[in-house]
UniProtKB/Swiss-Prot annotation:
The gene is mazF. It comes from the Bacteria. Toxic component of a type II toxin-antitoxin (TA) system. Ribosome-independent, sequence-specific endoribonuclease that cleaves mRNA, thus inhibiting protein synthesis and inducing bacterial stasis. It cuts between the first and nucleotides of 5'-UACAU-3' in single-stranded RNA. Neutralized by coexpression with cognate antitoxin MazE. Forms a complex with MazE which is no longer active as an endoribonuclease. GO terms for biological process: mRNA catabolic process; rRNA catabolic process. The keyword DNA-binding does not apply. It comes from Staphylococcus saprophyticus subsp. saprophyticus (strain ATCC 15305 / DSM 20229 / NCIMB 8711 / NCTC 7292 / S-41). This is Endoribonuclease MazF. Signal peptide: none annotated. Its EC number is 3.1.-.-. SUPFAM superfamilies: Cell growth inhibitor/plasmid maintenance toxic component. Belongs to the PemK/MazF family.
Length: 120
């Protein structure tokens, strides 16, 4: 069974505009109850283009620690729901420490955690 924090290769095509596409790694961010019973799964895209602007919704992952082809970045602003049939093969899983970074970036992406106060 797939678990929250697992990294899979997934087929993200077709896409529109600035969405991440193609066959690429994704990290499962859906809870494990949903992973067990739902035909869909919530994931965040991973990119190997680490020269992208580092923003608070990005979490870096090292190739040597996570058995990836290159150092990569989880894009927690690129969250989407996929049919489980889009998942190809499990590559690795993230440590509890790394998942805490992912959780923080999700909080920021969804506005659950404010970076700075916004005064009206």
């Amino acid at each position: 069974m797939m678990r929250r924090g697992d990294v899979y290769l997934a087929d993200l095509s077709p896409v529109q505009g600035s969405e991440q596409g193609g066959i690429r790694p994704v990290v499962i961010i859906q809870n494990d109850t949903g992973n067990k019973y739902s035909p869909t799964v919530i994931v965040a895209a991973i990119t190997g283009r680490i020269n992208k602007a580092k923003i608070p919704t990005h979490v870096e992952i090292e190739k040597s620690k996570y058995k990836l082809d290159k150092d990569s970045v989880i894009l927690l602003e690129q969250i989407r729901t996929l049919d489980k049939n889009r998942l190809k093969e499990k590559l690795t899983y993230l440590s509890d420490k790394k998942m805490k970074e992912v959780n923080n970036a999700i909080d920021i992406s969804l506005g659950l955690h404010t970076i700075r106060s916004h005064k009206a």
